[in-house]
Every structure is written in C-alpha cells, then in structure tokens.
Amino acid sequence: MKIVIAGAGDMGTHLSKMLSGNGHDLTVVDVDPKALVEVGNLVDVVTVEGDTTQFSVLRRAGVRKCDLFIAVRSVENDNILSAVMAKQLGAKKAIARVDSNEYLEPNSKEVFIDMGIDYLFYPEQIAAHEVINLLGHTSSTEYVDFAGGKLSMVAFRLELTSPLLGRTVIDADNEDEDLEYRVVAIVRGARTIIPTVEDRFEEDDMVYAISRHNATHKVVELSGRREVEIRNMMILGGSRIGVRIANELQNDVNIKLVDYDADKAFRLAERLDKTLIINEDGRDTEAMMEEDLAGMDAFVAVTGRSETNILAAMLAKRMGVKKVIAEVENINYISLAESIGVDTIINKKLVTASNIFRFTMTTEVQTIKCLTGSQAEVMEFIVKPNSPATKHKVCDLGLPEDSIIGGVVRGDRVFIAVEETQINAYDRVVVFAMPDSVMRVAEFFN
C-alpha cells in the first residue's frame, strides 16, 4: 500500500515506524528539513520537504497514486485542508487529526465526509475514553471489548498473591472447566511470549487473556488483585485529556483536579462545576498529603509531561492509591514506568495508531488495538467466505508462530478457541499477533 503521511512530528514519526515494518511504500512530508532527516534516519521512507496545503507539494509526494493519506500536522486546519486537497487529487482514502470534539459530532462528520475526508481522529479524546474504560476495570492494566462486548481482552500483572504463580498454562487450562478464557501472551521483562502449555507463570509477569465477557471478573482474580469501586479520584493536569475525563465522570465520582497554573485552574473552575480544582504542584509531597492523595481510589496523571506524570504516579503508589494511571508520551519511558509499579500507561500515539492501523488492512478488521505493555496487536477479523481460515481446524491452519487465536463469536454464540475449533464464514475472530506477522495473519481471513 502506498501511504503519504503529512507531518514528521511525534505522531508522524511513530506512524512511520509502525507502518514501515508491514511492507508499505511510505512517503513523509514536512516543512521542517531537520524533522525529515530524523525520520529518514529511523525508517526507510521517502521524504518530501514542503507544505501539504500546496497542490505542488502534494503532487511531488505522489498523492495522486496513494492508497492512504494521513494528515498529522500540528495545526488542525492544515490537516483538514491537506486531507481535502489530497482526496481531490486522487488519494483513495484521506484521514486527518483534529483538536476539537465539535468536528466529531454526527452533523459535522457528515460535512467532512461530503468534503472527501474518510475519517477524523482526536487523540486526546481517544486517550480520555481509554482512561475512563480502564477506571471501570481497576485490576486490569489494559482492557478491550470485541464483538459488541461478547469477548474481552484483559491484561493483568501477577502479584505475589496470584494463584497462578509457579503453575503452567496447562494447569490453568485444566481448572477452566467451562472454557471461559485463554491466555494468549505473557510479557516477561522486555520479552513477549506466545505461551505453550508447558510455560510457567512467574511473579510480575504481565498476562494477556481473551475471555468471555461475563467471565472477566474471574480472570482478573487470577492476578491476585481485587476490583475497586472508584468513588474518589484525583486528576493531575488540566490538559485536554484531564478535562475530558473530569467532564465525563464528575457526576458519578468525587474528583479533584490539580494544576500548577493558577490562570488555567481559575478557568477550569468555571468550566467544571462539579469538580474541585486545586492550584498545586502534583510533585509536592506535602501538598498532595494535604489534599488527601492517600484517600483516593484512583490517581490519573495527564499533564502532558512524561517525567512529571511518572514522578507523580510514583508518589501516588507510595501513598497507597489503588489504581494509578499515567500518560507517558516518551515511548522509551514506558518500560521504566511499568517497572516502578505504575498500574497502567496511556500513550496517545499508541491509542491513536490503533484507530489508523485498520485503514492499512485489506482484510475486514472490526477492531484493532496496539498494546502498550507489549509490542503486539490484538485484532478482531470478520471472516470472508472461502478464506483460508475456514478450510481447517485451528490446529491445522498453519498460523505464524508469533500469533494465536483467542476467541470466536458466531452470532450469539461465543467460543474460546482451542485446537479443534472450526472457523466459519462471517465469524468474528480475535487474534493476538506480533507486528511482523500481522499482515500474514490477515491473509487467513481474506
């Protein structure tokens, strides 16, 4: 697939790295020659210097023959205009990043579709929804629903009290008499393991399981932790993410929102009438003790500065907060944050990439999630008639070794996949796969 990316900033660079490993023909366009040199040193891409709001630059980038145009420049209006122009020049699909929720409302979306833009995405909104979802599943570090909620992916870290410690995967399978879940991956240190029946669980393992939706509570109990009802929460950072979280939850949860900027705190107090706004530095231990951080059920650090968020999250964990979530935009810091005990990491680039990645797939993908705690992806495919996946049982399909089928939904029936499972046309199939095998896996369902 020929893909043109407008913008060589953080988002554009991350997308370039993610998509380059899947055999795509990538071109990156930016007005900043230094940014182009940096992305060119990291990834095998064609770079074009120029402004994508100019037809001449779009033509030089080969937009007329591109399959997908992705506008991720820093200025919202530039993204919208670039996407419209690219579509008019012949791009098969054009998608754009925006910074306003207003553009995502149904009436507005129809206007943009008429203009030729296939999809608009607002990273801060996507990240806020991710946080809200995770606050409803406090024992999980990552949580995704598939097939309208019939199947779920649950990720959890094994505590010292976990009943799985020292046991093998087959031991866990034998106890799951009703076949309600399947372990699809174990992350140990920096290594992601697609487990065999003989693999043994160890303390601090990150376990990924596909589960029937009504059994997720049983699965997370295997972590050694219990779900916590969130009644009192503190948000650090009056960022777009922080404001969206507070706005959506303030009617149901007692929220304190902390921001060090006095002017911003004053404006937020006018906007969030049911949220207590506090003008303090979230890294100040004494100030946080006075604001009863230790009495919070959840702490969410979303200042936009990775270092600040990690330090504040460490403080919250030390004070005994049960659920701690931190926004970490520097991908190099994610493993550090996890190693010091931060429960869940949010990264706008990763959550947004999940929404964009499905546009690069030729197979019908209903849902795709780029995982934070692993380099892997988990996908929900809709099986086409006569596709290779329907020809054999799961054990004989010949899937890549670094992939595994977790579950199948057939109408109202839900199956946890085993070796003897037979996949039929129009089934919804949830697959866990490492990046290098994603495209090969997709071919089985096409």
Language-model features and meaning:
Residues 1-446:
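Cytosolic regulatory regions of ion transport systems
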